[in-house]
Curated annotation (Swiss-Prot):
GO terms for molecular function: iron ion binding; protein homodimerization activity; tRNA binding; tRNA(Phe) (7-(3-amino-3-carboxypropyl)wyosine37-C2)-hydroxylase activity. It is an enzyme of class 1 (oxidoreductase). Binds 1 Fe(2+) ion per subunit. Fe cation binds at H160, D162, H235. This is tRNA wybutosine-synthesizing protein 5. One of its GO terms (biological process) is wybutosine biosynthetic process. Its cofactor is Fe(2+). tRNA hydroxylase that acts as a component of the wybutosine biosynthesis pathway. Wybutosine is a hyper modified guanosine with a tricyclic base found at the 3'-position adjacent to the anticodon of eukaryotic phenylalanine tRNA. Catalyzes the hydroxylation of 7-(a-amino-a-carboxypropyl)wyosine (yW-72) into undermodified hydroxywybutosine (OHyW*). OHyW* being further transformed into hydroxywybutosine (OHyW) by LCMT2/TYW4. OHyW is a derivative of wybutosine found in higher eukaryotes. Gene3D superfamilies: 6.10.140.1470, Cupin. Residues 102-267 form the JmjC domain.
Length: 315
């Protein structure tokens, strides 16, 4: 079966009211052009970021290969002064390096104490945070975090989903974003919130034969573009150039639905986690049966879940 590739729609000059009343309820990805993002799109050069961002220590991912894999952890965590990170990430080859002269760098900013604090560029990088204007296309009390992201050219981030809605603001550089519909999760060979399929452009079909059935939505983000990624939509990111971006995460569900210990915004909602725990206990109970009976009752359970929990309101 040939994979289905679909373009992510692009709209220019969308107002807050248009987004919230007509676009947001559709729960589909959308590229927004022409939004007021402040002076960051003109200011954030390598020199400016290095000078103004200063020598604050940041924890980064360092990979010897372009395709980062969170499941096998084919990268290491290291610490660099922010200005050094910016300079190295902008290079193709390095005189100073941790693994190899062509290693790749990736920053996903953290709170001051990642165990307790969420990332907010205005708090962790106040000298730069004032340059960016957030598109407040949500209620202020829904705001969760603003994550600073810096990537080396060629770096590919694994396919994963987040449990909160977010805007990916591409401040400088260019990214290719590939998204997959949450309803196609069964084709993505998941391990937790991540897909095992690293090479989405040329997957191993002997190992992942169902992957081409997943609908694939694609867009190219350039400086000044903002991508709306609804919660639960899988996304894979390739930095085609050295790039700087900021993610704005906000709560789509009431606050009490989320895990209060989650500072990254990637823990499943409390009710979902509880349901999975109950399922694990049910599977353990089923294992007490002989194979023939276990298979029979497992199929009955699947049919019941499909009947009671699957929605007919989503494509």
């Amino acid at each position: 079966m040939a994979e289905q590739r679909l373009p992510v729609p692009r709209l220019r000059g969308v107002s807050r009211e248009q987004f919230m009343e007509h676009l947001y309820p559709q729960r589909k990805p959308l590229v927004l052009e022409g939004l007021d993002l402040g002076s960051c799109t003109s200011k954030w050069t390598v020199d400016y970021l290095s000078q103004v961002g200063g020598t604050k220590e940041v924890k980064i991912h360092v990979a010897a290969v372009p395709q980062m894999d969170f499941i096998s952890k084919n990268f290491v965590y290291r610490t660099l002064p922010f200005n050094k990170l910016v300079q190295r990430a902008a290079e193709e080859t390095h005189k100073e390096f941790f693994i190899s002269e062509d290693e790749k760098y990736y920053l996903r900013s953290l709170g001051e104490d990642p165990r307790k604090d969420v990332a907010d560029i205005r708090q962790q990088f106040p000298s730069l945070g004032g340059d960016i204007t957030f598109p407040m296309f949500f209620r202020e009390e829904q705001f969760f975090s603003s994550v600073f992201r810096i990537s080396s050219p060629g770096l590919q981030l694994w396919t994963h989903y987040d449990v909160m809605d977010n805007f990916l603001i591409q401040v400088t550089g260019k990214k290719r974003i590939t998204l997959f519909n949450p309803r196609d999760a069964q084709y993505l060979y998941l391990s937790g919130s991540k897909s095992e399929v690293l090479n989405i452009d040329s997957p191993d079909l002997d190992k992942y034969p169902l992957f081409p059935k997943a609908r694939r939505y694609e867009c190219s983000l350039e400086a000044g573009d903002v991508l709306f990624i609804p919660a639960l939509w899988f996304h894979n990111v390739v930095s085609e150039e050295f790039g700087v971006g900021v993610n704005i995460f906000w709560k789509h569900l009431p606050s009490e639905c989320y895990d209060t210990t989650d500072t990254y915004g990637n823990k499943d909602p409390v009710a979902a986690s509880r349901a999975v725990q109950i399922l694990d206990r049910a599977l353990k109970t089923l294992a007490e049966l002989p194979e023939e009976y276990r298979d029979f009752y497992a199929r009955q359970m699947v049919l019941r879940i499909q009947d009671k929990a699957y929605s007919k309101n989503f494509e």
